[in-house]
Amino acid sequence: MIDALKNGEIKAPYMVVTYNQTKGIGSRGNSWEGLGGNVFMSFCISEDELPSDIPPPTISIYFSMLMREVLSELGSKCWLKWPNDFYVDGRKIGGTLTNKVDEIYICGMGINLASAPENAGILDIKASVDELVWGFVSMLDKKILWKPIFSKFRIDFCKSKSFITHIANRAVSLQDAEICDDGAILLNGEKVYSLR
């Protein structure tokens, strides 16, 4: 999608949804292959189509929390691990990755609905791809401000403290991390933003 946007083949807003992903990119540049029966979507949206109070480095948190809201409304107990992973019962069920080209955000999101790689989980409720995609689009259209989104994320962040995250290619415990109002974390006196 990034190349298509740069080449002028598509214009924001634009979304693609698939049940199989063969050339996905995960966090830290890892390749990502999605298993069949799950939902994978990529979309691009102009920065001026979003609430102006969103701190740009935390846009993945914002998009992820919108989807988490959709899942919660459908009855899921999923939560968001800092900075961009969906979890149920201690297992990762999906994630979000966002890039920016000029004033356009490009976001990829995947959620395991039916199958999962080893050591990962699947969504804890039955939900269709249409329910998730259209629910997400509806949430996006509401242009919910950062503050109410962040207040819910702050609660989820407490669960993140029993996990690790990767910072500068190192596995780092989140046990002593503190969340900042802009979605960054304070870790050992250093402010760290998610660049995913």
Where are these regions (language model features)?
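N-terminal lobe of the biotin/lipoate ligase/transferase fold
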Residues: 1-69, 73
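Long, positively charged amphipathic alpha-helical accessory segments at protein N-termini or as interdomain linkers
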Residues: 7, 48-78, 88-196
